[in-house]
Amino acid sequence: MRKAEISRKTAETDISVTVDLDGTGRYDIRTGVGFFDHMMDQLARHALIDITLRCEGDLHIDDHHTVEDCGIALGQALTRALGDKRGIRRYGSFHLAMDDALVRAALDLSGRPFLVWNLPFPTEKIGSFDTELVREFFQAFATHGGITLHVDLIHGVNSHHIAEAAFKAVARSLREAVEPDPRRADAIPSTKGML
């Protein structure tokens, strides 16, 4: 069973997250940050990973701790659900078009966290949401999920479309990478023998 549950409590946030890598993309996200919830819905739906996420954060300060800490907890849950990563495809990539926006994502569930980020936003905010928090989320998610992640904007003029295309592109890449590979049923996808 490729499922995991993580609880994470700090002075800034109180988070619980469950993931099912063999789900259908069901989601129940409540962080108190509307735009971020919308993006997390997209991540779950397009990765076909069931995600339940609850966060009580210090939103009276700003959204930063909530968004970053959700990335940490989700990355930890992914790591736990993958176990030793036996039988997975490991790699995934996807080009995602959404109206004016075209985003490319590529990732490796290598256990070596690294983020390459080339996703400039034309505005500093999407409604009240700081666009810089998109990178903060993916940095935390990649670090705590042990993911090498590249996200590149190929074209885009609308910040909402760019952000949504990024979440969907990463989701589709993740969907490919966590999927069981029938040709490697019980094999670790590395010549090292471990990830």
Curated annotation (Swiss-Prot):
What's the protein name? Imidazoleglycerol-phosphate dehydratase
Traced from the root, the source organism's taxonomic lineage reads:
Bacteria, Pseudomonadati, Pseudomonadota, Alphaproteobacteria, Rhodobacterales
Instruction: State the reactions this protein catalyses.
Output: D-erythro-1-(imidazol-4-yl)glycerol 3-phosphate = 3-(imidazol-4-yl)-2-oxopropyl phosphate + H2O
Q: Which domain of life is it from?
A: Bacteria
InterPro entries, alphabetically?
Answer: IGPD_sf (IPR038494), ImidazoleglycerolP_deHydtase (IPR000807), ImidazoleglycerP_deHydtase_CS (IPR020565), Ribosomal_Su5_D2-typ_SF (IPR020568)
Which pathway does this chain act in? Amino-acid biosynthesis; L-histidine biosynthesis; L-histidine from 5-phospho-alpha-D-ribose 1-diphosphate: step 6/9
Compartments, as annotated in UniProt: Cytoplasm
What are the annotated GO cellular component locations?
cytoplasm
